[in-house]
């Protein structure tokens, strides 16, 4: 990645202006029709993280065309400083220690000069010292070793000999690029190479003292995985096995730090097993963690202190420590009837930052002080959306009887009868929509549409529900969506003659499949970065030597090889002759996940077939709609198209 300019620059004047009102009062309810700009812009407030000692808060504030990373003290709310972000794609903000903030940024570019390979999204680390008000990109340079100045995985912070040390995986250059583990010792941010691997799929586990406890290595060509432990500068093979797709995953350490917790997949279910780091023996499976969709780790030790269980309409936070669980239960009581997510916490959990979603507060960030037993609203995520539309949890039976959970967002101020409907399947498809603030669904509801977001089979509701989607692309995963339309029509909520389908990524595929392989359900389709040609998509994965990815997609799609006739059967591009409704394609030029080519070839095929089709190209946009300008472009293009082909009034 070129580094012709720093991704951040310090700008204390704008920081002071923007940070002065991080704590804000609730505004009056919004007007009936909220403009698209209110949803298309990046959030007014995001990435709100509290310092380890609980005395400071960092956050990203966007006002008009100004976007800043800011730091303020809690209590007096004094501004310590800030850094101007501009159009940098900021992905994550976290504290290294009480004086340093680490920002992860990304950009789309080819490999560095002298190397071949596909254009991809490259991630870099930037350090912001809040005492010296200095912004410095972290350097992975280790002479004479050749390295790329990029990060390729999760970071970890440990305290080593009284000094904060950041650990991050990067890339070293041998005959090809290989993953390496680096350390950065603060305050100088001194860089050290501590390990490297010859296999692309490698992960390291750092113990509380900052030593490598173990690493996971996957040999893609052999489908062989290994877990090796590290002691006295010697590697010992602790476990190995073969897996074409579902490999083990290191999660963190046990409560006493003596064991590494590894998640295995057995008979489709997740199983946690402890590996004793002293003698490399395996303990009995742990029941308490098997159902967690995500673990909660102690920041400076990597010890697992709890987890999150995903359910259809909420997430359940579970802490193993009784006092921490009491903290969380008190928080839930402070926000009755609202959905709460833990955004960040002080090291002792006495102060936590929360995302709060609900009818009372809308979508806000809040600070809860355990000792004061008091919650304070820090600010609204979207300033101009004070009263979001209701997002209602629903469920309905699919044709084969499987219960499909989902969410229905209803426009404000209208009768819940015979509404125009937008079906909006999520991407992934191994993902799931959850109850909260969805800027895209809210934007459509503000225009007068009901929005159905089904968690079709193949979604990550639980392991069996996920597996129910294997081999069902364009089949039952597709009819799960239209079954939702029929259900809502039967309930009298929507008008079945006024339904369109809109989606991104896999959702974009589903939108195209809904008007090529189905007929009479939808009046129009909007595909954002959708897959149209599965054969071409599979070829792009194979060309990049992503063998485990290829096997993953083959299983999910339900094909056995590049010559499988089912590829054509479920590729929208092979069925353009069946299209009898207008289609809008939207795609970012910088998309490195679903190539822009997927929309380009679909455009040509539909035009050759004489169908009604448009393509809206988003310049400098990636797969994730990361920029305000192009996110708004997508909303404006899709809403104009929907109003022309499925008027809400």
Model regions: which residues?
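Beta-propeller folds
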Residues: 19, 30-352, 359-361
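Bacterial N-terminal signal peptides
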Residues: 14-24
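Active-site-proximal cap/loop segments of hydrolase catalytic domains
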Residues: 456-649
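Short coil/loop residues immediately preceding or within conserved phosphate-binding loops
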Residues: 36, 45, 66, 90, ...
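Signal peptide processing junction and immediate N-terminal pro/mature segment
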Residues: 24-30
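Cap/lid segment of the alpha/beta-hydrolase catalytic domain
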Residues: 385-497, 504-505, 539
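N-terminal export leaders
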Residues: 5-11
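Non-catalytic accessory segments flanking enzyme active sites
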Residues: 202-205, 307, 316-413, 439-442, ...
